[in-house]
Structures are given as structure tokens and as C-alpha cells.
UniProtKB/Swiss-Prot annotation:
Species, as recorded: Sus scrofa (Pig)
Gene coding for it: DAD1
Membrane topology term: Multi-pass membrane protein
Signal sequence residues: none
Function summary: Subunit of the oligosaccharyl transferase (OST) complex that catalyzes the initial transfer of a defined glycan (Glc(3)Man(9)GlcNAc(2) in eukaryotes) from the lipid carrier dolichol-pyrophosphate to an asparagine residue within an Asn-X-Ser/Thr consensus motif in nascent polypeptide chains, the first step in protein N-glycosylation. N-glycosylation occurs cotranslationally and the complex associates with the Sec61 complex at the channel-forming translocon complex that mediates protein translocation across the endoplasmic reticulum (ER). All subunits are required for a maximal enzyme activity.
Record's protein name: Dolichyl-diphosphooligosaccharide--protein glycosyltransferase subunit DAD1
Domain of life: Eukaryota
Subcellular compartments: Endoplasmic reticulum membrane
Cytoplasmic side: 2-30, 74-92
Pathway note: Protein modification; protein glycosylation
CC annotations in GO: oligosaccharyltransferase complex; oligosaccharyltransferase complex A; oligosaccharyltransferase complex B
Residue list for modification N-acetylserine: S2
InterPro entries, alphabetized: DAD/Ost2 (IPR003038)
Length: 113
């Protein structure tokens, strides 16, 4: 069973590295960074506590919101989804991402106090 799992993972990595555009790989690295940051914050919350609760909540909401916005950007700029987003150029999708991220972080900073 482990051999089949390893073969699936190696085939996935080969296809990902060969067929995924550089823009999407960069965005995937950003998504991994946000995911690890959120997991680190949650682990810190479990181990140490949530004394400044607003700060923890703001940071975690920022991670979750940023992850969701980045996934939406990835879906919109993926060349395989070109038919679904005919009226939206990659530049427009990125501008929408920047605008939504700015609003998200303004709300998060307001929540911190």
C-alpha cells in the first residue's frame, strides 16, 4: 500500500512541476506560507493560551481571509479556468485581490484596537 501512495505522490509532483505555470507555483508557495502561519498561530494558542484574545483572533482571521482570497485569485488566473472567467484578465483578478486584501487588513487592524 505504501508503494502505491508513494507512486501517486511522485506522479503528482512530476505533473505539478512540469505542467503548472510559474505564476501558480508562486501563488501556491504563498498559500503554503499562509497555511503554516495559521497553523503556527493555532498551535501557539493551544500551547500558551489566548491572553490577548483580540490579537490572536485578528491574526487568525487575517490568515484565513488571506488564504481564501489567494485561493480565489488562483482559481481566476489558472489557464484551465479561462472559459469560466472570460471577462476577467489576470491583472484585473490581481487588482481585485489587492483591493479585497486591503479591506480585510483594515478590518483586522480595526479589530486589534
Amino acid at each position: 500500500m505504501s508503494a502505491s501512495v508513494l507512486s501517486v505522490i511522485s506522479r503528482f509532483l512530476e505533473e505539478y512541476l512540469s505542467s503548472t505555470p510559474q505564476r501558480l507555483k508562486l501563488l501556491d508557495a504563498y498559500l503554503l506560507y499562509i497555511l503554516l502561519t495559521g497553523a503556527l498561530q493555532f498551535g501557539y494558542c493551544l500551547l500558551v493560551g489566548t491572553f490577548p484574545f483580540n490579537s490572536f483572533l485578528s491574526g487568525f482571521i487575517s490568515c484565513v481571509g488571506s488564504f481564501i482570497l489567494a485561493v480565489c485569485l488562483r482559481i481566476q488566473i489558472n489557464p484551465q479556468n479561462k472559459a469560466d472567467f472570460q471577462g476577467i484578465s489576470p491583472e484585473r483578478a490581481f487588482a481585485d485581490f489587492l483591493f479585497a486584501s486591503t479591506i480585510l487588513h483594515l478590518v483586522v487592524m480595526n479589530f486589534v484596537g
